[in-house]
Amino acid sequence: MEANEESLKGKIEKLEGKEVIVESKEDEMDIIIEENREAEQEVMEVKARDGRGEQNDVLMEENNNQGEQKDEEMQDASSRSESSDFNSDEDEQILSRRDDELDLEKPLSEEEIDELISDLLAVESKAAEAQEALEKESLSKVESEVREELAQALRGDELDEAVAAEMMTFKDEWEATLDELETESATLLEQLDGAGIELPKLYEMIESQAPNGCYTEAWKQRAHWVGTQVTKETVESLANAERFLHTHRPVRKRHGKLLEEGASGFLEKKLADGAVKESLAGTSELDWSSLNKVFSEKRDESVSFGSKQWASVYLASTPHQAAAMGLEFPGVNEVEEIEEIDASLADPFLADAIDNERELALTEEQKTNYIRVKEEDDITCDRVLQLRLKRKRRKKRSKQVIRCAAENMDDDSVYLDGNNTTPNFAKDQVKSPETSTQVHNSEVNIEENGNFSNSDVDKMTPSTHINVDAKRDDSQNPANNFRCTACNKVAVEVHSHPLLEVIVCMDCKRSIEDRVSKVDDSLERHCEWCGHIADLIDCRTCEKLFCASCIKRNIGEEYMSEAQSSGWDCCCCSPIPLQRLTLELEKAMRDKKSIELSSDSSSDSSSDNNSVDTDADVNVTISSKKKSKKKIRRIIDDAELGKDTRTKIAIEKARQERLRSLQFSARYKTISSMGDVKSIPEGAEVEVLGDAHSGYIVNVVREIGEEAVRVPRSISAKLKVHQVTGIRFMWENIIQSISRVKSGDKGLGCILAHTMGLGKTFQVIAFLYTAMRCVDLGLKTALIVTPVNVLHNWRSEFEKWMPSEVKPLRIFMLGDVSRERRFDLLTKWRKKGGVFLMGYTNFRNLSLGRGVKDLNAARGICNALRDGPDILVCDEAHIIKNTKADTTQALKQVKCQRRIALTGSPLQNNLMEYYCMVDFVREGFLGSSPEFRNRFQNPIENGQHMNSTAEDVKIMNQRSHILYEQLKGFVQRMDMNVVKKDLPPKTVFVISVKLSPLQRILYQRFLELYGFSDGRTDERMRKNFFAAYQVLAQILNHPGIPQLRSEDSKNGRRGSIVDIPDDCSSDENIDYNMVTGEKQRTMNDLQDKVDGYLQKDWWVDLLQKNNYKVSDFSGKMILLLDILSMSADVGDKALVFSQSIPTLDLIELYLSRVPRHGKQGKFWKKGKDWYRIDGKTESSERQKLVDRFNEPDNKRVKCTLISTRAGSLGINLYAANRVIIVDGSWNPTYDLQAIFRAWRYGQKKPVFAYRLMARGTIEEKIYKRQVTKEGLAARVVDRQQVHRTISKEEMLHLFEFDDDDEKSEAVTEISKQNEAGHSNLVEQAILWTKKATLSRVGGDKLMENLLQRHGPNWISSFHEHETLLQENEEERLTKEEKDMAWEVYRRALEWEEVQRVPFSESPVVPKPSPSTQTEPLPQPKGFNRSRFVNRNCTRIAHQLTLISQGLKVGSSTVCGECGRVIRWEDVIPASKLSAVIVN
């Protein structure tokens, strides 16, 4: 024993002298965390290396055991632990391929024992540190630091909640770390015990040195239970226990291994008679109770590690016994059960084991954590852990070599941390996770024999980033598996190439951006991919250059050979060869979940990086997982934007300044020539000149000497006032002036955001005829890309509005020729000129070279679409909402900058979609996406919730106003207010419908069964949100729909989901970069999930046979059928919209049972009394149904059933004046379009719409979300301040069921038993109906009857939808607040402009003289204030206006901002006028 002790002391002293023992606790934890990652990486490398040599053997073995493995997997699925960290396919492969390396039976060498002891010392040291970190003293210190840091931004209860959340996360992280360390410690102890090391002596030495490494007072002064003097009572109890064990359980050991167990009390207990059993059992209880009594009597909950209670953990053999002894350590409440044993119960050992299992009494928490495991699971876990520890020791030896080599390296090669000479490969990730330094673009190579390869060390560069998650493993970094396509090095941080959709590292991205930002023509030509200047190859269709190495390395040698021999189309012109690299970039970006792009990604310029780094101090403490209202970061200044963005803003400002000055001149001429302002058409802009007989003039704002351009007379005669305004708006942006176009100006883009029904198609046709036929501008080709379902409508509109006085435009369509002749058709279009109509799908495929077999033809088509159009028009442009979609990328490849985006709903879901569309027409105007998030999206969305603070609302209004003002020059918005007087009134009722008892039961069971009501919906909601929503929506329509779908599936019919594809990724600004293929896969997965939910048997026991045939189980169906019946009685036609095909099928079933009025025994028939339009309806058949429905003589048809997505766009059903929306869409635009199918030109009756909404369910929350989206659009596009209707918390808890019906039903039952109560209930219902009828039915007799019939039984409440979108006067910005917000926005840009003015042109500005005043321009009565807002401009602004127009002393002009006449004499003192005269 003494020899072993001396040997052990020598080994510890030897290890203490080695450099392997780390110098600080922080470094120890760093090594532990980093080496786990490196061990996993090495396992993968070994796996790949060995896999090549052993591939055949492994494949043979897998083929032989494939059937057996499948059976075992099916049998063991229920017993496999979900929480197992090691039972994975990867670990099994590692073990199967590395058994020769593991060799657990081989005796350990002295060196390996030294390493094990070293590892144990490190693990125990970190475990002690973890325990100290969880002491009250340590926690109090950390809490005070956290509170002090958070107190800078938070106060009161909010501060307390934030501190509590941070501390909870802090403790959880340390407890998890402690749990991992204890697992490692147990494995190491087992190996040391097997090697013959006396563990008590080892622990005695560890404990004797423990106080020297403590930093808390509690641990420095604690009484150690090992190696210290204990009480006599404890010694006596231990001696009694030892004597009992020696008597009843004699054992013989050698080197710590159990060699033999004699006829102990266990065998005697099995084989002896009952009396002996009772005697032994009693003796055991008496012997052990004395020791347990010692611990139980002096138990103190406040006693921590190192006390007697801690020592008692070694006496507990089961978690139950540990819990009974009062131990509250990790693992106490985790109970594992061995798998079922197939054996005879006659075996006394098995029988006793089973009896013990049955008698096991577990606590509630232990029952919750009850896990069933297999015996091989434990073996696999053990072996994998030992393998990882062995590899970690090898890595530690390699680190010694790195340290030695690092001392001889230059300081420039290694990034040093303070005075420490060791390369900082791993910063502290647990205790101080503030920054981390990583090795960039290199992997240090270490041979098995310890040799160090420093070939790549000189390429190391530091990269600092914020570590958001203190426990995150570096192996999760998506850059670990990706290389930079420019420098071919491992990218520590994955970034997108500024020009190509491929992966580049940070250094390469910055280098490329610096080259792009330098527009000096004298610079050397360089590769657009990597920036090199050697071996460049020209693109034959554009001016871009690419080096041969980039082409060869990234695309392939074959492509390189072809490029050198016959020329090539570069990756910008033909991105098809980059598809693989683009997919890699998408994968890397999706894996980068822990870092939010808006706050941590690099901006497009160095100034962006500075703006991010100079933000308010970022909270880098361990963040809480609790979601709450965002705390937005500092809004970056406009001076910090990229150079390109600032340039485009300046161009737009100069354009508006020029237009304003010319507009005022035109206004003066108009007023003087007309004499009477009243003669100006009401509602039109003041600058409207010309008339319908001679043709409206489009270039009212024109330069001196420029001829007037008129709209053709035949078209002008049919234009309305707002349409004339829209044509002029497009001219001012697309053309600007005749001289500019002829001088080669590329023009600008715009968005015509007129709401549905205002004639956007007619306006575009009029504009194209004016620009391409009425004046010679050299513009002869136009490309119109539109949804395929309105493609033929465009052609018919061109034919309908064809003018007679000018040559008609040629119209081309792909359907006019065969596929083989498409290239010829496009060539003819480019040569002859005209308008080419094309669907989005065909445009995308042809632009990307898809669907064309002939390679030359494919290239020709791509070139024609890219270079051919002089004007590009995109109908329904809100489709352009995904920056990474193929359609968006194809449209952006078109070189034409004269782009017109048509949309009735420019902002549908979120601001990022709006940004995508704006960035298409004016690329770079709003900056990069992170800049837009910081400046507009986050402030606006953060202030639109009910629980937003006053400051949030104020910032929201300011940023909304600034965004509106910034975009109003090229985004023209008009709503139905301009034509309200031409249409009958419209009323939209939102009816809150109660659920039937069966619906409530099904709804609650689904939520509980699939975990949507347990408060743990974060990950589940993300994966299964829309599938669950579809199931619930169908239950809310009718509880029998699952039954109906089940029968349809048995008959081979499958109900489709209509209203899903674009909604899945457009609501919370997430996945807006999802590629098209992924979206289609998401759609298919969604359909499968919905079918899976409905095909399971969770609803079978609740539904009786043919429940779906009874309409009374759904309040929606009762109200729907009643509305249709009453509409038919009064002669009104109705439209019924629903999202799902099964719901429409069920409605058709009920309609087939409705009796015909006055026809005994006759019922409604499809095709006679109702029509149906869905996605399966052919285009020709659809138009026939629409025409028949709109026929005034067709009195028999009562309604048309329409699927929301398939029929809410592109059809006119003005014959109907009743619209019923059975289930609201996630996107409010679809429901709005559904209503506008009836409320449009041609409608003669008042329109009433009924939106049925299930009360207290997800439908009600989604409706509030719709109002939020419409309010967001109103704020940004329509500049209204609407009421906020939903809180952030409601948005995160959409599945919560607010079921008050059970309470109301209980009250109803009680009242029914009481006669007086019953009469009161009837009187209350009558009073409720009268009150609602008198106040809110809006003159709709049908709604009044509906309330009287279904009052409180089915209708919970109702309101008019428009009331929620009325402007909130309290939140409207005053003129002063608007001016202040706009002035703050313009201040940086104006200051930059002043700095750019030459000294000779910027006279000194004196202090304003009180005697100097400007005379305002007299405003006519018809002056439109919505366009020209009076402002108080500065003298500097007036000076800049005078300079920009080149005016001299004595001349005057009108300021486009404040509307004042300005002269040099008014803005500069007389003493300074001489300088202006000279200049």
From Swiss-Prot:
It is found in: Nucleus; Chromosome, Telomere. The keyword Hydrolase applies. Disruption phenotype: Slight sensitivity to gamma-irradiation. One of its GO terms (biological process) is pollen development. One of its GO terms (molecular function) is DNA binding. A zinc finger (GATA-type) spans 483-514. This is Protein CHROMATIN REMODELING 20. It is an enzyme of class 3 (hydrolase). It comes from Arabidopsis thaliana.
